[in-house]
Structure formats: structure tokens, C-alpha cells
């Protein structure tokens, strides 16, 4: 499928919502199927969990990764780059950088802009203390997803937290990592066991 953009840099056939200042209201562009109530927000306040997102404030919602991907597609980008800042058994930090396509909000040939100037970066981490037991096996992926979500959200001024960004540990103790496992089959360790 090929997406066609008009002279303003917007996808043809898409109904965009606008703010009073004529910029795009990217928050309004999030389809309801990509949102759901933030269970933690309601539990912390001993309030019943709503069955729909209707009428909820942004701080009472979470956005799915699918919603962030949809926003990035609507906005348009040239490329996405990831840099691993830190990668240890119990802590991974990743920086995501996105080269956005110019549009009327930040045109390519505006004063001070040159091709490639529409770049935004953000960073996120995943640790054994802020992920669930299952996710602790995939810290690199979780950190990359969190960085992507933050990069898109912050560039487009979206104040709904991404589901991928929140602490999913539920207060449980992290899985104990045995640092010596990586050396378990090293020749010296095999000899020491005999």
C-alpha cells in the first residue's frame, strides 16, 4: 500500500482534527480502540474500573503501542533509529530517534529548516524492577518500545502515557539474576566441578 501526501504533508483521505492555533490535534487523532482505562490509576484511588474510555481524562488512560504506531504513520517519518545506551542483565536503556517528514507544522523549506531538520529523540529504560516477570526476559525489546512510544508521544504533544511505558512489576520482587550463569559452561568452571 502506498500512502499519498498532499502539499501540506498530510495523508490524503484522512480527516485531521485541528487545535485553535491551526496545528494538528494529534491527541484527537487517536482512535478509541487504541485507548483503555489505566487500571493502576483507579486502583490507587479505590475507584471502580470503568468499562469504556468515554469521558475519561488523559491521565486516566493508557495508549496501546498500536495507537502510537498509527500516530507515527499518520504524521509520517523517513526513518527510525535506535541506540542502545546501556545493556546489562538487569538494566537496558535505549534512545529512539525519528526523522519526521516535514509538513505544514514544520515545513522543510521554512526559514532555518533544511532537509532532515525534523528530528526528535527520546530515551527510556527497562529494568528488572519496572517490568513483570515475563518482560524481564526481553528488557531490550521493552526498552526499545518504551523509547519509541516516548519519542512519538513527546514530539506530537500527547499526554496519555503509553501502556509500554508504565511499571508493570506490580510491586513484585524482581527475578533473581545469577550473574555466574554466563560462565557456567566455561572450561574453567567445568573443570572446577569435577
Where are these regions (language model features)?
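Polyanion-binding surfaces on beta-sheet-dominated domains and ring/shell assemblies
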Residues: 1-192
Amino acid at each position: 500500500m502506498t500512502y499519498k501526501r498532499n502539499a501540506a504533508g498530510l495523508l490524503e483521505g484522512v480527516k485531521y482534527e485541528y487545535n485553535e492555533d491551526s496545528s494538528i490535534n494529534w491527541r484527537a487523532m487517536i482512535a478509541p480502540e487504541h485507548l483503555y482505562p489505566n487500571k493502576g490509576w483507579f486502583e490507587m484511588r479505590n475507584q471502580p474500573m470503568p468499562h469504556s474510555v468515554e469521558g475519561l481524562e488523559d491521565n486516566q488512560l493508557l495508549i496501546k503501542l498500536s495507537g502510537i504506531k498509527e500516530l507515527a504513520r499518520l504524521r509520517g517519518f523517513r526513518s527510525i533509529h535506535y541506540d542502545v545506551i546501556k545493556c546489562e542483565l538487569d538494566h537496558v536503556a535505549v534512545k529512539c530517534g525519528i526523522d519526521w517528514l516535514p509538513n505544514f507544522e514544520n515545513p522543510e523549506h521554512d526559514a532555518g529548516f533544511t532537509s532532515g531538520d525534523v528530528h526528535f529523540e527520546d530515551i527510556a529504560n527497562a529494568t528488572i524492577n519496572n517490568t513483570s516477570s515475563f518482560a524481564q526476559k526481553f528488557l531490550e525489546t521493552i526498552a526499545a518500545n518504551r523509547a519509541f512510544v516516548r519519542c512519538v508521544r513527546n514530539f506530537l504533544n500527547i499526554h496519555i502515557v503509553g501502556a509500554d511505558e508504565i511499571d508493570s512489576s506490580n510491586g513484585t520482587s524482581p527475578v533473581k539474576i545469577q550473574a555466574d550463569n554466563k560462565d557456567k559452561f566455561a572450561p574453567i568452571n567445568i573443570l572446577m566441578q569435577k
